[in-house]
């Protein structure tokens, strides 16, 4: 994955050089034409890119969280990395993409081995610290390319915290109605379900084990998912909640492309949104 991202950035530099007949352009010049990956720069290349006009995109996807018996633990991370590549190719100028955060607030899945979560306050503080670190160099506009649902709660708190520092933070929200998803969905569910499995059949089909997919849609109860039929929360012996057997690559393609359009629209809205007021300067 990292090799692919490195090759993508190298290709952009090489293409620019070939079109001009000169050496590759400085990243600050390149940023005026395409989005760039922060992790592939040196600090002195990053310095001129991190300006008040820059939008910083930070992907967020769990690196180890259960997704039923048919999807990998790094499902959300793979999704975040995929959307990162799509933003890299299609985002407007002056967008810097930071490395993906692969830990977060996922308490609902801890009964399933391999799943990880940090506390709400840790998730909130982690985003705050990362954003403030980068804002120190100039940027005030940030977008979290979020692939989770439980992550929305700490992200909302972070947005409030950072606004007090004059920093704008917005994030992708998968709970908002998507007309394409609404049209294609045939069953309920919200986790490793028909929709998420369809997306992965399009994004990374080699990671999906459809032979192990099974309908698992018991009554939704307060709390997380549980393997115990008498336990608190929603009973799910598989770790999924929905019917992944209905998933298809074609549905996934339509839903993913709709999500990409939403992400790019969100980023453009971040570009033009009013910034929160800066705090008073201390005497």
Language model features with spans:
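Bacterial N-terminal signal peptides
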Residues: 6-16
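Extended, histidine- and acidic-residue-enriched regions that form the cofactor-binding/catalytic faces
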Residues: 20-121, 125-142, 147-283
């Amino acid at each position: 994955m990292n090799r692919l991202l490195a090759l993508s950035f190298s290709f952009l530099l090489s293409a620019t050089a070939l079109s001009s007949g000169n050496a590759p352009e400085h990243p600050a010049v390149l940023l005026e034409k395409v989005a760039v990956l922060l992790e592939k720069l040196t600090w002195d290349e990053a310095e001129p890119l991190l300006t008040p006009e820059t939008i910083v995109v930070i992907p967020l996807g769990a690196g180890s969280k259960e997704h039923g018996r048919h999807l990998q633990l790094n499902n959300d991370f793979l999704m975040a990395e995929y959307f990162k590549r799509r933003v890299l190719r299609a985002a407007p100028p002056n967008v810097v993409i930071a490395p993906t955060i692969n830990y977060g607030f996922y308490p609902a899945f801890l009964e399933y081995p391999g799943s990880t979560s940090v506390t709400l306050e840790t998730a909130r503080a982690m985003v705050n610290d990362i954003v403030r670190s980068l804002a120190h160099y100039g940027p005030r506009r940030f977008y979290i390319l979020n692939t989770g649902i439980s992550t929305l709660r700490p992200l909302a708190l972070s947005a409030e915290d950072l606004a007090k520092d004059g920093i704008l933070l917005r994030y992708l929200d998968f709970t908002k109605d998507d007309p394409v998803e609404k049209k294609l969905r045939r069953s309920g569910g919200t986790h490793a379900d028909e929709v998420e499995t369809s997306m992965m059949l399009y994004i990374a089909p080699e990671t999906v084990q459809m032979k192990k997919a099974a309908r698992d849609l018991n009554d939704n109860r307060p709390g997380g998912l549980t393997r115990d039929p008498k336990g608190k929360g929603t009973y799910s012996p598989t770790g999924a909640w929905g019917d992944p057997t209905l998933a298809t690559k074609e549905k996934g393609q339509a839903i993913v492309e709709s999500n990409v359009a939403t992400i790019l629209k969100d980023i453009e809205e971040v570009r033009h949104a009013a910034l929160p007021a800066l705090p008073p300067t201390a005497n």
